[in-house]
Each structure stands twice: as structure tokens, then as C-alpha cells.
């Protein structure tokens, strides 16, 4: 059964999508894991990182073969969404799959319309739509990664309900430190709220943090990471995060090749395998797998 993990942060520009895509690619390509990336952000960044724009537009159409249709079915009581039709197998693709065991359930811009529609049903279990639709397919994968939008609205709550853990990518600075406390409190409050609806598994908790855009210049970044470690230990003692939560290493160093790889619609390990970004994500994926396998 898949380990389901939400990549989440209220802040943008912290490497959330980069971490989702590149860790997924490394796990699938080098650790022989079966990985599904579920793009839940209406910006569709994971989808467009792993698919050519024209291929993505043709695939999702008006959202029918995307996660948008999954939510619409639950809202309207229809049965249009078909997992096997919606999922793109073996992404990225050229004439053939480049990573055979990496799949994508793409987003579409129509997701912008869905929040208000979901909240019309907020007195029901609106947070369970995603899990109910994916549950029959979880045995096909070792990992399911949810690339969440930078908020804690209905779609993100669906991801949290479907997840055992969430991972918080962040840039080590003061704003990330202050924002992490709010995020940890909100995730913990939601986990307590849904605990009565989760059967046979634990409610979601923060299981790890990832450092991105790291620069070993001076001691500013090192000091910020040290402060985050102290806050993380405080939250573990207060049971706001998982007792085993840690800041995974290596830290992802700032690397132009990671940004360039988005233009090529490739994970950095396929774009420039010898870059420091590819090396960091390769090692981080190993640490990531070891960490989460020890928790399950």
C-alpha cells in the first residue's frame, strides 16, 4: 500500500513543486519505487514540469481527465472521472516513457473554480473526496505525492485527509520560521478534527522538513536551520508534529539547473545529471525513502 504524503507550505517560492517532482523522479528512476504525483495546484506546475504544454492541454481538455473532474463528480453526484484515463503513465514522455514507474494525475486551471463548490458541501465529509477516489488504486504504488496549493483550503484539506504525513519544504529564513508555527498548528488542528473519520490509519502529521535554496555563505542559513531545529524539537515535545519528524539532509543547494529543467519539462536528474541540484535530490531521495519507510 502506498505511503501518501502531502508537500505543503503556505509560502510560495520555497521549492515545494521542485521537491515533489524531483524526489518523485529520483525514487522512481533510482530506487525502483512506483510513484504517483497528484497535482492539486490550479497553477498546474507539477503537471507542466512533467508534461509538454501541448500534450498537457490535449490530455486534460476542459478538466475531464484531471483531478478537477474527480472533485466535480463528488460535488455533482456524477461518475465521469476515470482514474486510468486521467493518469499519465511514465512521465516525462517523449516518444516513450522516460521514467516508466512515475505517473502523474494532472491538474487543470479549472481547479480555480472548485473551492467554492466544495465548500457548498462543507457540512458533509468534503475533505474525503480525494481519498475515496484514490483508495482503490493505492496498492499500485509505493508512494503517492500530493503537490498542494499554498493554502489550507478545501483541496489541501482533501490531500491532508488522504495522507499519513506531510512534508514541509522551506527556505531557511525568519519568515519561514514564523510561518512554520502557524502551519504546524493548523495541520494538527485539522488532524484532530478528522481523527474520527480516519479508520485503519493514523491522521496526518508533519513528518519531515526539507531545506531548499541553501547557500553555504556566512552563517545566516546555518543559524536559521538551527533555529528551525529548536522549534521542531519544541513542537515534537508538544505533539504538534510527528515524534520522528526531522529536517532531512542533504539540504538542496541553490542550483540554476533546477530552474532550467522546468523549461525542458524534465526533472533535474534527466536534465543535467551531474549538476549539484541533481546530486542533492538523488541523495535526498535516498534519505527520504529511508526516513518514511522507518515510519510505516
Regions found by a protein language model. Name each.
Residues 1-296:
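P-loop NTP-binding core
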Amino acid at each position: 500500500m502506498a505511503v501518501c504524503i502531502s508537500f505543503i507550505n503556505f509560502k510560495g517560492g520555497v521549492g515545494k513543486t521542485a521537491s515533489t517532482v524531483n524526489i518523485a523522479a529520483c525514487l522512481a528512476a533510482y530506487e525502483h519505487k512506483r510513484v504517483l504525483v497528484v497535482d492539486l495546484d490550479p497553477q498546474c506546475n507539477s503537471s507542466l514540469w512533467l508534461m509538454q504544454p501541448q500534450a498537457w492541454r490535449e490530455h486534460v481538455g476542459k478538466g475531464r481527465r484531471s483531478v478537477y473532474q474527480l472533485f466535480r463528480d463528488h460535488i455533482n453526484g456524477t461518475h465521469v472521472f476515470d482514474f486510468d484515463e486521467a493518469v499519465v503513465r511514465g512521465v516525462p514522455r517523449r516518444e516513450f516513457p522516460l521514467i516508466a514507474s512515475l505517473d502523474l494525475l494532472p491538474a487543470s486551471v479549472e481547479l480555480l473554480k472548485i473551492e467554492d463548490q466544495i465548500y457548498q458541501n462543507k457540512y458533509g465529509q468534503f475533505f474525503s473526496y480525494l481519498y475515496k477516489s484514490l483508495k482503490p488504486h493505492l496498492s499500485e504504488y509505493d508512494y503517492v505525492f500530493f503537490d498542494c496549493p499554498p493554502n489550507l483550503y478545501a483541496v489541501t484539506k482533501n490531500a491532508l485527509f488522504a495522507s499519513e504525513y506531510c512534508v514541509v519544504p522551506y527556505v531557511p529564513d525568519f519568515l519561514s520560521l514564523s510561518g512554520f508555527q502557524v502551519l504546524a498548528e493548523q495541520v494538527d488542528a485539522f488532524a484532530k478534527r478528522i481523527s474520527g473519520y480516519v479508520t485503519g490509519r493514523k491522521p496526518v502529521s508533519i513528518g519531515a522538513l526539507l531545506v531548499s535554496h541553501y547557500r553555504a555563505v556566512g552563517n545566516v542559513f546555518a543559524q536559521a536551520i538551527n533555529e528551525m531545529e529548536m522549534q521542531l524539537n519544541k513542537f515534537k515535545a508538544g505533539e504538534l508534529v510527528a515524534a520522528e519528524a526531522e529536517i532531512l539532509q542533504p539540504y538542496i543547494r541553490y542550483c540554476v539547473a533546477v530552474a532550467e529543467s522546468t523549461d525542458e519539462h524534465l526533472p533535474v536528474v534527466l536534465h543535467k545529471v551531474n549538476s549539484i541540484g541533481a546530486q542533492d535530490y538523488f541523495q535526498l531521495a535516498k534519505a527520504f525513502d529511508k526516513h518514511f519507510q522507518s515510519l510505516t
